[in-house]
């Protein structure tokens, strides 16, 4: 949990403690209004919060993780490869997804039948661990030069995507889940009716809501992935 989130929680707990000590109905009302304003302000301008319901971003984000994210202005935010973003699904805006940015404007993304992903001809990541079940790769985030892992399920057959190569135009990003064989992402996304064929699977920057910052804690009762369907991997935000 980062400093800001700790400070906010401490402030709310302090208010609740004062409410308990006062035990005055009018003080209850004022305190609830203050807490509501704090939560609204934080969510609107400083931090977003979400609960992850599936394992599509494992091992980075697990089912049951409560995460904090920074609201983004798609026109001003400098996005980088490796950023984890929360966004509205291209064809179903009521669904909210969380994925990792792999390709930016000007990139050529290639997905091969051995499940590897290349950016401008260079493979993403290096093999770290391999067994009969999974292969784990390590790759680098551009923003902080830290490593992250993504996983390929060796038991799953190759599923042909809508395309095997995308050229990313201005205003769009290409996203993938870290749990590659258990993620519905730019390889398979449907887009709104009328979207040109070469844009299928890509996510408009204007659909981006926020950028992942940190994981606060894991809700134990949600640790087992209750997958609600590969077509509706929804992040609960309200």
Residue ranges and their predicted role:
Residues 2-23, 59-238:
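Soluble "head" domains of membrane/secretory-pathway proteins
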Residues 11-18, 40-48:
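Short hydrophobic alpha-helical membrane-anchoring segments
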Residues 25-46:
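Internal/C-terminal transmembrane anchor helices
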Residues 46-60:
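N-terminal signal-anchor transmembrane helix
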């Amino acid at each position: 949990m980062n400093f800001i989130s700790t400070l906010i929680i401490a402030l709310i707990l302090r208010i609740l403690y004062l409410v308990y000590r006062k035990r005055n109905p009018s003080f209850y009302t004022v305190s609830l209004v203050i807490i509501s304003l704090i939560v609204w302000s934080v969510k609107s301008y400083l931090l977003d919060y979400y609960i992850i319901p599936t394992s599509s971003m494992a091992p980075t984000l697990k089912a049951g993780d409560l995460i904090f994210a920074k609201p983004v202005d798609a026109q001003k935010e400098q996005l980088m490869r490796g950023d984890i973003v929360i966004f509205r699904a291209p064809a179903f805006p009521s669904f909210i997804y969380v994925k990792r940015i792999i390709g930016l404007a000007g990139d050529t993304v290639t997905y091969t039948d051995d499940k590897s992903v290349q950016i401008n001809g260079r493979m993403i990541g290096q093999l770290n661990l391999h067994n009969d079940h999974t292969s784990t790769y390590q790759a680098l985030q551009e923003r902080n030069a830290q490593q992250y892992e993504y996983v390929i399920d060796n038991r799953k057959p190759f599923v042909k995507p809508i395309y095997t190569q995308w050229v990313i135009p201005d205003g769009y990003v290409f996203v993938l889940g870290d749990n590659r064989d258990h993620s519905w992402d730019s390889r398979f996304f449907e887009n709104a009716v009328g979207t040109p064929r070469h844009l299928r699977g890509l996510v408009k920057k204007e659909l981006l809501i926020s950028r992942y910052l940190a994981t606060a804690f894991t809700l134990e009762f949600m640790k087992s992935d209750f997958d609600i369907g590969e077509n509706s991997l929804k992040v609960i935000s309200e």
